[in-house]
Amino acid sequence: MAIIGSSYTLPDAPIILANNLLIGQPATATSAAGGFPASAVTNPLTYERWAPATGGSSAVTIDLPGKFFDTIAIAAHTLGTNGVTFTIAGFSGLLGWVDLITQTPTTDEPFVLCFGSSRIFSKLRITINKQAEIGVVYAGLRLNMPLSIYGGHTPDTLGRTVEYTTAESVTGNFLGRTVERAGYEASYSFKYLGAAWYRQNFDKFARDAITNPFFIAWYPSKYPLEVVYGWTDRTIVPNNSGLKDYLDVNFTVKAVKHG
């Protein structure tokens, strides 16, 4: 899918969505197939998913904790494969249900919606017009990196990592190949981040990334389709750059491929 802005111009610098407000929040659905509960959308796992029991229009509704958010994201879904049109709506006691966006994706890759200002609702609802699976839903305050990335970075969705087994005959003929695991991997390097900015903003993400995945788009304005839902394989730790009051940080993102 993509990262898009609603009354918001996407920047050149990376956007990260972590610190999900929806983790562990109550969730209900108009219906749920066996083994596909509504509660699946409020944990960060990609293999647990909600799916309605029948076709036609269905919805999953998630309680919000009464905190501001400016970004919503969806991952681990089959909306593109199933040709689904979905609508995200928010509920408040003053306005009732307010539609935020309607989309018809063509792939199963992550979707990220960035608002130009913070919102607050008591509930979030995702309505789909036909049967599909949704595994991950995030809402929170995005982290806008102050520095852009240009040279030396492998775009996330081009950094394919594939583990496979190749079958060959005794005479060396190619007999086939079995893909055992496929995903993405990309390394991020940021230099000269202000120490105060790091402690106030980036460190919240670094702490959350110890236990939870996150959404990241490396160049939103130019490559809005290149967004992934991934995790780090080690703790994110900064280094003092030695120049005035700056910190450098490096980390690697590993992501599952859904599209």
For every predicted segment, state its role.
Residues M1-A59, D63-G83, L94-G96, L100-G259:
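Extracellular/virion structural assembly segments
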Residues T85-A89:
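Beta-strand signatures of extracellular beta-sandwich domains
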